[in-house]
C-alpha cells in the first residue's frame, strides 16, 4: 500500500469533534489494530463546562489528512507538499494545510516540520510511505494557560503575542485564523521533549521514522533545512520511483521484484572501524572489497602503485560488476570514497565521519602507513547531509539509525546471535511509555499489530489491571483462533533490556 499521512505531535490525548474517515480508520487498523468505533456522542469536561465530542482516539496522534494508493496513482505529478500542504499556504485546501499556518500565527513561532520517506521493494512491487510530522512550538514558552470555550480548547505553554490569559482574545484569534478550531486539543512541547514524546506515538509507524525525524528536529531547530528533505517534499511522486542497479530513471507506479532493487551504500573513511560494523552485523553490512577475487585484488594492487586514477576507475568498475552479479546481496556496502559507490551504480544513503581527525589517527596507530590516505578521505567528506560525532560508538549508532530508516524491516543483530527475526504482538498495546521500540528493533524483535500476527509469532499479554483493553469483535476472533506461543509478562515493571532478554530466550 502506498500512502501519504499527515501527523501532528501535539497532545497525549486527542479529542476529535468529528468521526474518523474510512481511510483513516483503515490506516489505524493496519498499524494499531485497536481503532474504536465512533460513538454517537460523548462529552469532554473543560473548566465548568462539558463540551460535546464525537470520538476519542486512543493515541497521541492527530491524523489530519490521509491519501491512499489510488489517490497517488491518479495524481502522479503531485508532490508531498502538494498533497499535504505548505505551512505558508494561507488558502489551504486540506485539513492539514488549514491548521498549521493558523497555529503558527497564533503562537507567534515556527512549527518544526519533518518529512520521512521510506521506500520498500517487495514481491508486490515498489511501495512508498510518507510520514509528515509537526512538532511545536520549539522553544521559549513560559506561561501555562488553560483556555476553553464552546468552540475551542488550548492547553499550551507559549510566549505568543496574544495574551493567553485573555480568553476572549484567544478565542477570537482562533476563530479568525483556524478553520478547524474545534478539531483538537493542543499541547505544546520543547525540542528536548521530542524523543520521549515520539516514543508515545504509533510504534509501528515510528519505528522506522524516529531516527530520521529525531535528527531532522535537531537540524531544523538550528534554523536550517536539509536540501534533501526539501527536494523530497517537492519532488513529484512518480519521480521518487527509480529502477535497476545504477539507474535513476523516473517511473510511473509499477511492480517489480526484490532482486531488482538498487544496492545501497554508505561512505565511511579508513580508521572508522567499518570492519566492526560488517563483522557485528554481517547480514546488514558488507565491505566494498569483500566480493573481489584474488585476481581482481592483484590487478588493483598493481595499479595502485603505478596509476592512482586508473586504480580508482578499475575499483569502481569492479564494484559495479559485483553489484550486477548480485555478490553484495541485499546488504549495505561500506566504502571509503563516494566516487566508488556512485560510479559503481550504488545509491549512497549516508556519509559519516568522526569530527576530530586525531581520533582517527589513534585508531590507525598500528597502521601508520594508512594515515595519509585516511586523512585524504576524511577531508573529502563535507557539506550538507554529512553526519559526524566525536565518539565512534555514537557514530555507529547514527549509521544504524540511517540503515533502519532506509531499509525498513532490517534486523540489526550481533553476528554471534541467531539471525532469525522474533515477531511479537503485545495484546494490550505496546508499552511505549516504559520501553523503547527502537531498541527492540535493533535487537531483532519486530513488534506487529494483532492483524499482522501469524501463528509463527509470539503473543504477549501484559499483567496488571490497567493493561486490560477491550478488543473489537474482529480482533477478538483473531485472538481466539491464534495457535502460536503465548506469554504473560509484567512489562510495566521490567527494564527494556530485561524485556529484550526475555523475548529473545523464548
From Swiss-Prot:
GO MF entries: RNA binding
Q: Which Pfam families match?
A: Phytoreo_S7
Has the keyword RNA-binding been applied to this entry? Answer: yes
What InterPro entries does the annotation carry? Phytoreo_S7
Give me the ranges of the annotated region RNA-binding. 128-249, 325-355
Family classification: Belongs to the phytoreovirus protein P7 family.
| Biological function | Probable component of the transcriptional machinery present in the inner capsid. Displays dsRNA binding activity and may play an important role in the sorting of viral RNA and virion assembly. Together with the RNA-directed RNA polymerase P1 and capping enzyme P5, forms an transcriptional complex positioned near the channels situated at each of the five-fold vertices of the core.
Instruction: Output this protein's name.
Output: Protein P7
Question: Which lineage do the record's taxonomy fields give for this organism?
Answer: Viruses, Riboviria, Orthornavirae, Duplornaviricota, Resentoviricetes
Amino acid at each position: 500500500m502506498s500512502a501519504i499521512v499527515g501527523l501532528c505531535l501535539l497532545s497525549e490525548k486527542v479529542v476529535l469533534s468529528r468521526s474518523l474517515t474510512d481511510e483513516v480508520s483503515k490506516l489505524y487498523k493496519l498499524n494499531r489494530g485497536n481503532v474504536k468505533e465512533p460513538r454517537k456522542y460523548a462529552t469532554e469536561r473543560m473548566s465548568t463546562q462539558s463540551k460535546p465530542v464525537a470520538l476519542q482516539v486512543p493515541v497521541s496522534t492527530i491524523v489530519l489528512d490521509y491519501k491512499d494508493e489510488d489517490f497517488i496513482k491518479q495524481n502522479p505529478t503531485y508532490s508531498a507538499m502538494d498533497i499535504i500542504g505548505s505551512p505558508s499556504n494561507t488558502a489551504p485546501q486540506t485539513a492539514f494545510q488549514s491548521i498549521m499556518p493558523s497555529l503558527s500565527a497564533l503562537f507567534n513561532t515556527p512549527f518544526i516540520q519533518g518529512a520521512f520517506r521510506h521506500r520498500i521493494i517487495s514481491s508486490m512491487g515498489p511501495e512508498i510511505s510518507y510520514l509528515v510530522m509537526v512538532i511545536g512550538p520549539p522553544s521559549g514558552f513560559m506561561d501555562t494557560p488553560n483556555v476553553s470555550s464552546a468552540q475551542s480548547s488550548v492547553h499550551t505553554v507559549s510566549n505568543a503575542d496574544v495574551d493567553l490569559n485573555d480568553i476572549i482574545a484567544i478565542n477570537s484569534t482562533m476563530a479568525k485564523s483556524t478553520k478547524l478550531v474545534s478539531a483538537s486539543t493542543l499541547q505544546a512541547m520543547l525540542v528536548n521533549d521530542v524523543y520521549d514524546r515520539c516514543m508515545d506515538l504509533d510504534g509501528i509507524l515510528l519505528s522506522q521514522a524516529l531516527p530520521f525525524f529525531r535528527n531532522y528536529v535537531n537540524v531544523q531547530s538550528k534554523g536550517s533545512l536539509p536540501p534533501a528533505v526539501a527536494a523530497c517534499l517537492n519532488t513529484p511522486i512518480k519521480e521518487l520511483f527509480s529502477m535497476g542497479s545504477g539507474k535513476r530513471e523516473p517511473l510511473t507506479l509499477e511492480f517489480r521484484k526484490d532482486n531488482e532493487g538498487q544496492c545501497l551504500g554508505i561512505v565511511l573513511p579508513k580508521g572508522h572501524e567499518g570492519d566492526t560494523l560488517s563483522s557485528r552485523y554481517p547480514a546488514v553490512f558488507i565491505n566494498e572489497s569483500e566480493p573481489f577475487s584474488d585476481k581482481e585484488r592483484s590487478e588493483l594492487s598493481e595499479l595502485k602503485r603505478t596509476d592512482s586514477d586508473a586504480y580508482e576507475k578499475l575499483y569502481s568498475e569492479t564494484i559495479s560488476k559485483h553489484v550486477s552479479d548480485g555478490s553484495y546481496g541485499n546488504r549495505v556496502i561500506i566504502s571509503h570514497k563516494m566516487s566508488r559507490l556512485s560510479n559503481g551504480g550504488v545509491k549512497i544513503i549516508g556519509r559519516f565521519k568522526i569530527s576530530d581527525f586525531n581520533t582517527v589517527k589513534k585508531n590507525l596507530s598500528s597502521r601508520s602507513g594508512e594515515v595519509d590516505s585516511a586523512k585524504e578521505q576524511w577531508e573529502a567528506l563535507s557539506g550538507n547531509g554529512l553526519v559526524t560525532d566525536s565518539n565512534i560508538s555514537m557514530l555507529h549508532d547514527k549509521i544504524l539509525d540511517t540503515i533502519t530508516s532506509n531499509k525498513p524491516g532490517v534486523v540489526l543483530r550481533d553476528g554471534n546471535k541467531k539471525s532469525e527475526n522474533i515477531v511479537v504482538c503485545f495484546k494490550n498495546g505496546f508499552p511505549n511509555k516504559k520501553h523503547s521500540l527502537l531498541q527492540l528493533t535493533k535487537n531483532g524483535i519486530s513488534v506487529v499489530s494483532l492483524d499482522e500476527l501469524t501463528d509463527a509469532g509470539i503473543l504477549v499479554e501484559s499483567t496488571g489491571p490497567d493493561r486490560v483493553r477491550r478488543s473489537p469483535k474482529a480482533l477478538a476472533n483473531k485472538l481466539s483462533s491464534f495457535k502460536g506461543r503465548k506469554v504473560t509478562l509484567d512489562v510495566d515493571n521490567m527494564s527494556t533490556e530485561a524485556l529484550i532478554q526475555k523475548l529473545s530466550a523464548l
